[in-house]
Amino acid sequence: MSKQLPQDFVMGGATAAYQVEGATKEDGKGRVLWDDFLDKQGRFKPDPAADFYHRYDEDLALAEKYGHQVIRVSIAWSRIFPDGAGEVEPRGVAFYHKLFADCAAHHIEPFVTLHHFDTPERLHEAGDWLSQEMLDDFVAYAKFCFEEFSEVKYWITINEPTSMAVQQYTSGTFPPAESGRFDKTFQAEHNQMVAHARIVNLYKSMQLGGQIGIVHALQTVYPYSDSAVDHHAAELQDALENRLYLDGTLAGEYHQETLALVKEILDANHQPMFQSTPQEMKAIDEAAHQLDFVGVNNYFSKWLRAYHGKSETIHNGDGTKGSSVARLQGVGEEKLPDGIETTDWDWSIYPRGMYDILMRIHNDYPLVPVTYVTENGIGLKESLPENATPDTVIEDPKRIDYVKKYLSAMADAIHDGANVKGYFIWSLQDQFSWTNGYSKRYGLFFVDFPTQNRYIKQSAEWFKSVSETHIIPD
C-alpha cells in the first residue's frame, strides 16, 4: 500500500566537504586529521573524490532536475582557517559564497554543517575534542561563519559526534586510532556537547533569524535474546552511542540512569568518569531549550548480547560480508539474529529501527520541535556498464528497495506523531568513503572517478517521483 508524505515535506541529497570536494591542496586549504592518517595507510586518497570543488554546479543542476529541494553540505574548516584559527583564507571564503549562491540559483536550500569529521591537523594534534583549545577555536570559527555567510538559513553544529568519539577512541577506526579508551570516548562526547551548546547559544544570541540543529548517528540497539543480561548489554551499548548524546543535546541534562550505565562501562575498564562543570551543564541546558531541530542519521540497527571478555573490533572496510567483529569489554558483543539481511559491509537492513528511533525522540525528548532524517542510504558495489554513453541509466534496484522500506517506516512514524520535516539521502553523488575509499557507492548519481563523468542511476528517477508526488509507492 502506498503512503503519503506531508505536502511541506522536503527531500534532497547529503554530502560532506572532505568526501566530495577533492582539491585538498588547492587554494590554501590546510591539512586535516585524515591527511597524514590516509597517507600512512596507503590504501586510498581523498583526491579527487567527486571533484565537487570544481563541479558543484553540475551536481546542483542534477539535484534540481531530479526534484531536490534541499541539500546537506559542510564547510571545510581548514579552507576558512587553514591552521584552525588565526589567518583567514579568502579563497576558501569565496568558494562557499559561490556554492551557496549556486544553491539559490538552482532553488535548493542548503543545510550547512560546521564540523563533518575534518578537524584541522594542528587542533587534532593538540587533542581534538579532548582539547579546550579545539573547543574555543571551534566556537570562534562558527562565529566567523555565522557573520560571514548570512545567506545560510539552516546550520548544523556537528555531524555524528558519536562516530567521531567512538571511532577515535573505542574502535580505533578514525585517527588517532586508539581503542578501548572509554574514558577518552566519554570525555570527548561531553566536550562535543559543550562546544555544540556554546555555538547554539551564540547563534541564538546573534538573532540572525535562521535555524540551528545537530546531526546524530542513531542506530537502534536491541537485545539479542530475551535474557536479562542481553537486555542490559543493549542498554550499555545504547548509553555509549546514543543515550548520553540524546540526554545532553535534546534534554539539556544527563539522566541518572544514563550516568549509571556510563560509570558501569568505565568501571569495567578501570577508567575514570568524565569531568564536567556546572557552567558547562548550564550551557548544555540552555542550548537544549532553544535547539530548532535534530538530524537523525540512521542506516542500520544493532543487536547486543552479554560479553565478558576483552575488547575486539574488526572493521569491514572492503565489503567482505561477515568479516565484522565488535566486542566491547564492559558493554557487550554485536550479534545479528538469524534472518536479518545485511549489506556487503555487514550493516543490517532493518527499517523498524528507523521507526523506533524517530518515535523515541518524539516520546522521550519533547523539547526538540522538529526532526529531519539527515542521512539514510545503502552502500553498494557498482560499476559502469561497458560502452556506457552519457544517456546510460544505471540500474540499482537494491537501493530503491532499501530507501522505499526506510521511507515507509519514516512515514509510519510521522503518522504516529513524529514531527519529521524532511529526508536527505546519503548520498547525492558517489563519494570518497573515510574507511572504504571508492569501492562503496551510495550516490543517486554515479561518478566515474577516473573521468569524473556523471551518470544517472534508476534510484535518482525514483527519488524524483517521490519528491514531487509526496507518495511512497508500494
UniProtKB/Swiss-Prot annotation:
An individual GO BP term: lactose catabolic process via tagatose-6-phosphate
Enzyme class: hydrolase
Catalysed reactions listed for this entry: a 6-phospho-beta-D-galactoside + H2O = D-galactose 6-phosphate + an alcohol
InterPro entries attached to this UniProt entry: 6P-beta-galactosidase, Glyco_hydro_1, Glyco_hydro_1_AS, Glyco_hydro_1_N_CS, Glycoside_hydrolase_SF
Matching SUPFAM superfamilies: (Trans)glycosidases (SSF51445)
Hydrolase found in the keyword field: yes
Assigned keywords, A-Z: Glycosidase, Hydrolase
Residue ranges of the TM segments: none
Protein name: 6-phospho-beta-galactosidase
UniProt organism field: Lacticaseibacillus casei (strain BL23) (Lactobacillus casei)
